[in-house]
């Protein structure tokens, strides 16, 4: 079902009903772009840590707009052993509300827009008919503005507004506005004396003049009239004054208040759908869904927090249960029988043995999708086939039980190992971001960090490390990359061999991480200095500590290419006999648990968060024997 601004309100109850009835949901988003700076390959480096990947996406992807949101609800019919689906395709756009903030600024990426256009995407449905939305802070501010306007209109008679120059008006009226206000009062007196006229339309005026009119009339005519602001076709605002008795005045005030509340709800718009999904606490399915989740939280709840641990806490408060089908398909027992985990190819593979396509049917009044037509990159369709993929894989897990189970529900313990783990694209040794605990910390003692001239290509790096057999290269930027060797003991040899190189520099991954942490500490210490000290240092550059200057230039420069050129890193006999590097295990550290999301979340989400923690404390730990088939479905701690 296609939902735009014009039919959103009349179909909202259908959306709520579908969410309430569903066993689980599948979601998908389409964006105005992916990266505003680095290329996608640089944005997704193969040796990113989860924190680094989060920071990259937060910095380079959140200024784009999620402008199409697909939602497909799935409800299992036990009588006919089939799923009933309801698909929704929402077009979303941050339309400015009633001249009030926020006036959202966003960016577009030409390649993304061109791609969507080639897929038949209708951008008019976004920019002309998109459903508005507000995050929770924007909604709070807008409601406060309305309350303030009402208090100004209804409470102008307070003594604090009495002018020392007049005993007739409790408002201080500027000299240049007194004539204007006197003319308005005179017109109202004529209206009250007239037996024929019931209404008076004033000329369009400024917001400040309207405020003076409201305050003056509220004090001078506490009864007998009703004052309302309307708007012309040209978007000019004017005031209408009507003669009414007290009962009619109260009725109109109540009517006006109800209209304002309705306008506020309209401004909140699509965010109400996200709130309903979140408050349901049900399982939300996505495919490669990290970016979808980040945009959803950022756009419809609150800006993303500064660090990953806070993001994890916030996300699990909003969506208690998430499942990523790309991670699921990349994990045993699926990994060995699914070669391609892209959504389109995964959907095709799961129709073949040993899998069985699920039996599904669209609910009455909802259009059905034909997977043969492949309406890819329509968010509603992508959400639909994401749900189908989940059902097929979940049911396949049921075949390992004794006796086999044909239908595995969204509440089954078989799929719990996949909860709240989001697939990390193109990371070689950390397959997922763990929202409910510490992330994996793989040993990277076989990885080197290499800096080199910007003229170098991938072939130059392969030539440099040709003596070390198979290598993997992950570019960081134009002048640096990670190089993964096949054997950890080769790292020491490569570093020692390159000590006197002029055009490139090699360090171990541990050294690279250590220096980055040192730079962060220096930067943090610098920012914590007083403004006075910082200003004095700006005035006198010689005051900058020598150690800081030396550290910066030592870590951020290398000799330009010389006539010596590149050389092959062939190890000598002496270097080959050097002792191996230390291969100690990196211990896992517990992530800090914060309440950073408590304030921007609703009371319902706070309660859900509390119940989830209680459940963790009260639920007995379930131990599964290593010989049990269930161990096949554990998301591994190592990759």
Curated annotation (Swiss-Prot):
Q: Which InterPro entries match?
A: CAF1_poly(A)_ribonucleases (IPR051181), Nucleotide-bd_a/b_plait_sf (IPR012677), PARN_R3H (IPR034042), PolyA-riboNase_RNA-binding (IPR014789), R3H_dom (IPR001374), R3H_dom_sf (IPR036867), RBD_domain_sf (IPR035979), RNase_CAF1 (IPR006941)
Write out the PTM section of this UniProt entry.
Answer: Phosphorylation by MAPKAPK2, preventing GADD45A mRNA degradation after genotoxic stress.
Q: Which residues carry this modification: N6-acetyllysine?
A: 220, 499
Recorded hits in Pfam families, A to Z, give: CAF1, RNA_bind
Q: Which key words tag this protein in UniProt? A: Acetylation, Cytoplasm, Exonuclease, Hydrolase, Magnesium, Metal-binding, Nonsense-mediated mRNA decay, Nuclease, Nucleus, Phosphoprotein, RNA-binding
Q: Which domain of life is it from?
A: Eukaryota
Q: How and how many cofactors are bound, per the record note?
A: Divalent metal cations. Mg(2+) is the most probable.
User: Which GO molecular-function terms appear in the entry?
Assistant: cation binding; metal ion binding; poly(A)-specific ribonuclease activity; RNA binding
**Any transmembrane segments, and where?**
none
Q: Which residues form the R3H domain?
A: 178-245
Q: What is its EC number?
A: 3.1.13.4
* A GO CC term assigned to this protein in UniProt: nucleolus
Q: Where would you find this protein in the cell?
A: Nucleus; Cytoplasm; Nucleus, Nucleolus
Cite the binding residues for a divalent metal cation.
Answer: 28, 30, 292, 382
* GO biological process terms on file: box H/ACA sno(s)RNA 3'-end processing; miRNA catabolic process; nuclear-transcribed mRNA catabolic process, nonsense-mediated decay; nuclear-transcribed mRNA poly(A) tail shortening; poly(A)-dependent snoRNA 3'-end processing; priRNA 3'-end processing; siRNA 3'-end processing
The positions annotated as site (Interaction with poly(A)) read 326
Q: Which residues carry this modification: Phosphoserine?
A: 163, 167, 530, 557, 583, 587, 619, 623, 628
Reactions listed under catalytic activity: Exonucleolytic cleavage of poly(A) to 5'-AMP
The UniProt function text for this chain reads:
3'-exoribonuclease that has a preference for poly(A) tails of mRNAs, thereby efficiently degrading poly(A) tails. Exonucleolytic degradation of the poly(A) tail is often the first step in the decay of eukaryotic mRNAs and is also used to silence certain maternal mRNAs translationally during oocyte maturation and early embryonic development. Interacts with both the 3'-end poly(A) tail and the 5'-end cap structure during degradation, the interaction with the cap structure being required for an efficient degradation of poly(A) tails.
Which proteins does it associate with, and in what oligomeric form?
Homodimer. Found in a mRNA decay complex with RENT1, RENT2 and RENT3B. Interacts with KHSRP. Interacts with CELF1/CUGBP1. Interacts with ZC3HAV1 in an RNA-independent manner. Interacts with DHX36.
Protein name, per record: Poly(A)-specific ribonuclease PARN
Which species does this protein come from? Pongo abelii
Query: What lineage is on file?
Result: Eukaryota, Metazoa, Chordata, Craniata, Vertebrata
Write the gene name.
PARN
